[in-house]
């Protein structure tokens, strides 16, 4: 009983010493939580909806270009806006905290890559990220292409490998990615890397389209089976 009383007294002492601090911290948590809910409901969600509305027609035009070709006029509209369409550069800048703003960076990077502006392609694509592995794989592959065009072979090779590894459970996508990385390694003198990746395609993805021809590429590098 005495021990219980001591615990109670210590609890009272704690409250007496720290009551103002506890109240302040508790109030701060409540206030921050309330502010976050208010921000989410009254600012962030409407902002996301607005960004989606602005990006929707741009995504339609981008999809059409991906199928028919990246004409100069269409790319300019996608990037900078026109004909009642907001450009992805403005959407990415104004709505950077939204999913649509993130997708706008991907589109901008792809457009820059297709028009030969490789430095800006790198800038936009490095700012893009998604949990959708197929899309992230494509972004990494484009980064590899941009770095290759800038003669930055080490970064190009790194992103080609990342393009494959981020989606390595998908046999088609991963085998294509690793094969591309292997070819790039072969053409840039990274012989040991090329051998390792060609063998990975053959051994890890035996049913892929490239697996049956891998021994031919290995033979070119002096590896005979």
Report residues per predicted region:
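N-terminal positive-inside, membrane-proximal cytosolic segments immediately preceding the first
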Residues: 1-28
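Short solvent-exposed coil/turn linkers within tandem alpha-helical repeat scaffolds
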Residues: 45, 92-101, 129-137, 165-173, ...
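Structured, soluble extracytoplasmic/luminal domains of envelope-associated proteins
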Residues: 89-145
């Amino acid at each position: 009983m005495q021990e219980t009383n001591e615990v109670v007294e210590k609890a009272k002492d704690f409250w007496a010493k720290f009551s103002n601090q506890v109240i302040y911290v508790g109030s701060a948590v409540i206030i921050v939580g309330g502010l976050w809910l208010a921000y989410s409901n009254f600012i962030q969600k409407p902002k996301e909806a607005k960004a989606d509305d602005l990006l929707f027609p741009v995504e339609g035009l981008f999809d059409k270009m991906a199928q028919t070709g990246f004409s100069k006029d269409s790319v300019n509209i996608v990037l900078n806006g026109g004909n009642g369409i907001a450009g992805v550069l403005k959407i990415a800048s104004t709505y950077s905290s939204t999913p649509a703003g993130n997708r706008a960076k991907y589109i901008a990077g792809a457009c820059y890559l297709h028009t030969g502006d490789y430095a800006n392609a790198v800038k936009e694509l490095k700012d893009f990220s998604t949990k959708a592995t197929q899309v992230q794989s494509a972004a990494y592959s484009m980064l590899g292409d941009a770095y290759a065009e800038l003669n930055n072979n080490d970064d190009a090779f790194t992103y080609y490998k990342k393009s494959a590894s981020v989606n390595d459970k998908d046999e088609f996508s991963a085998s294509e990615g690793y094969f591309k990385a292997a070819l790039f390694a072969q053409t840039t003198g990274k012989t040991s890397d090329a051998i390792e990746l060609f063998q990975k395609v053959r051994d890890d993805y035996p049913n892929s389209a490239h697996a049956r021809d891998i021994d031919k590429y290995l033979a070119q590098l002096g590896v005979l089976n």
